[in-house]
Amino acid sequence: MSAAAAPAPIIVTALMGGADFAWADGLRRAHFPPERNWLPAHITLFHHLPPSLLDEVAARLKRLCAGPPPPARLAEVMLLGRGVALRVESPALMALREELADAFAGLLTPQDQARPRLHITVQNKVAPDAAKALALALRRDFRPRPLAIAGLAAWHYRGGPWEPAMTAMFRGRSVAVA
């Protein structure tokens, strides 16, 4: 079996709407160390689900996306110690994640068992002083604002860039968040 065909852990993310993704990914490309920036901007919901769950994960993501997108907003600039992120607030997205966590409860890693702090990483694996400087710079102009969540996706993780496994887009009407 080739490395590309070998079973790989599944990562689950929320997908941003086009304009929000372009903006967040532009920040990430501008500030993430280029030699480590293998991924576009994303919101991770689960870091490591067993590869054997792919069919069930795909079915559940499609079912969850049959309704409207969860309201969400960018709440603040977060300092991660050696990086910077944008904190995402969305009780509805957290409820979707909790539904998935309940379904896969016995199969979650300790990291995925914990309640996540939803965020979009802009910079990571830099010196703490560089992270603090970027956080200060981003906070100067940052204002909380709505964030469009367009869908959910599953990815294969094989140690490098993630490989898409499936994508499901929300089909219901969008609800604005103040």
Residue ranges, per PLM feature:
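Charge-rich, low-complexity N-terminal segments
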Residues: 82-87
